[in-house]
Amino acid sequence: MLGGRSLPATDLARAAQISRSTASAHIAQLTTSGLVVVERRGRHRFHRLADERVAEAIERLAAIAPAQPVRSLQESNRATAHRAARSCYDHLAGTLGVAVAEALCEAGALDRASLELRAPDRFAALGVEVDALGRGRRPLTRSCLDWSERRPHLAGELGAAMLTALLDRAWLVRRPAGRAVAVTPRGAAGLDDVLGIDVAALAPVAIDRTPLRRVA
């Protein structure tokens, strides 16, 4: 759910490696507390985080939680992919997310201390129409502590719009499972041109040259 998706209880139980009844009990408590929202689609029920603030709280808790042991190559590869680049609710996180936020600060587009917007032109080069944002109740920008980097990445409406733009431009593509996203060759060139980010030198981020089916 940290990826901003709505999922059935069966999928959540499988991911947590618990029974469906146990998962349903936990989901009920989270729903009652207002942390999770239930969406009904016909006879089916899907569950998602209530909003970005819940996702941010989970990221902050994960940043201080002890690391989980890795027991297989598959788990290791998945953990590496998530550390490199992933979605945090609806914005970009991981090593790449932090690098993008820092590059935007270096360019004067964001205030380094608060990540507040300073110059919208740099976002236009990323495909974000800043003038169309900031009309709702959601904060335009928000600093979100990255659990894997222990440094902030950009959240808020602007952070969400930026991730959407990078996906729409095919600079990033979603992995078929989980929250990980991959940088395409086009994205590596674009990030270097606009923000001066050398993706090839940004371990553990790697340029994925394998054609990937875009996942909604």
Regions found by a protein language model. Give the residues of each.
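N-terminal helix-turn-helix DNA-binding core of bacterial DNA-binding proteins
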Residues: M1-S19, R45-H47, E52, S87
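Basic, amphipathic "hinge/linker" alpha-helix immediately C-terminal to the N-terminal HTH DNA-binding motif
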Residues: S6, E39-I64, A119-R122, G187
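Key DNA-contact positions within bacterial/archaeal DNA-binding proteins
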Residues: S21, A28
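Conserved catalytic core of two-component sensor histidine kinases
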Residues: S24-A25, V98
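Beta-hairpin "wing" of winged helix-turn-helix
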Residues: T31-R41, R45-R48, A113-S114, R175-P176
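Amphipathic alpha-helical dimerization/coiled-coil segments
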Residues: A55-A113, E129-A177, D198-A216
